[in-house]
Amino acid sequence: MEQYKIWVDADACPNPIKEMLFRAAERKSVPLVLVANQMLRVPPSPYISQVRVGSGFDVADQYIVDHVEATHLVITADIPLAAHVIEKGALALNPRGELYTTDNIRQKLTMRDFMEDLRSSGVHTGGPDAFSAADKQAFANSLDKWLVRVKR
């Protein structure tokens, strides 16, 4: 069991977040694993690796769930994946810096399902706001808090 590790649901993770994670992995010597259904560009590093999974619905998510441990952090905007990660005792952080917790994950799942129902009935709900500098800063702050806690 590795004490600390960061997993990334990498297919949908914004590039500025991946770049930040690459730097953090090197700076703090924390293993970083990007999981995607396509090859990614990752810098050469003993701390950074990638896993290419087959294409298909939730294949990357399932790989992460199968390998995550309680001391790990998962970066994902996928709320059902975050729920599974939390069930396993690990932490989940979205690319906008919001930490998913046992206190907020049920509400997030309910809202996600509600919005999905609206979309399937033909209601246009719009998408998330464009990824902003404020989102990047919020993510950096949340990541730094986790890194400080685990690297004491």
From Swiss-Prot:
InterPro entries, alphabetized: UPF0178
Superkingdom: Bacteria
CDD domains reported in the protein's UniProt record: PIN_YqxD-like (cd18720)
Pfam family name, one: DUF188
UniProt family annotation: Belongs to the UPF0178 family.
Protein name, UniProt field: UPF0178 protein Shewmr7_1635
Native organism taxonomy: Bacteria, Pseudomonadati, Pseudomonadota, Gammaproteobacteria, Alteromonadales
